[in-house]
Amino acid sequence: AVFFMNSANLPAGNVQAASASSMKKAYKKYLTKSVSGKKYYKIVNIGDKNKPVLLIGTYKGFGKGSYTGCNVYYYKSGKVRKVGSLSDGRDIALYTKKGQNYINSGLSDEALYLCVKDGKSYLCAYYNSHNWKIDPDDKYEKCVIKKGGKVIKNYGYMDSRQYNTAKNSYRYKSTVKFVKNTRANRKRI
């Protein structure tokens, strides 16, 4: 007896996420076709499960190849899309917390950590309001977590102790060194 299965009645399997190598190929193509040769970029593993993410520098930093600001691009559903940006007063650096990598920038009283979760920017913004309970004028800004630009958690104002606890829960790995968008540099992707 010959038996045929109708594939229309089979359950759909999970759609496979893009591999790191296919993401890097997409970033290489995007850099070649859509980004000026005068721009600087870096690919860092801050995406979903530390998958590759493309950063394009926007504000030059304080050393060769360093930037204090960047746009963040992510490959999802067959396209490279801008998902966010990060900019502040310090050179962008790579940090880690609970196995997830983040990029960071900040000032003496603020620390911004960004990664990509579920294909969206995930920003943890911490601000030091010092002794705001004693001196209400010392309120700086509310500490929040944003996903895709929307606040998903509001911590309110943090005093120095709370701010330092939050900030120090991330571990420094390295400064992010951007490279010029040249054919030679893209070959190394």
Model-derived segments and their meaning:
Residues 7, 18-20, 25, 29-35, ...:
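Acidic, small-residue rich beta-repeat scaffolds with periodic aromatic anchors
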Residues 38-40, 88-97, 109-112:
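Repeated scaffold domains used in trafficking and secretory/extracellular systems
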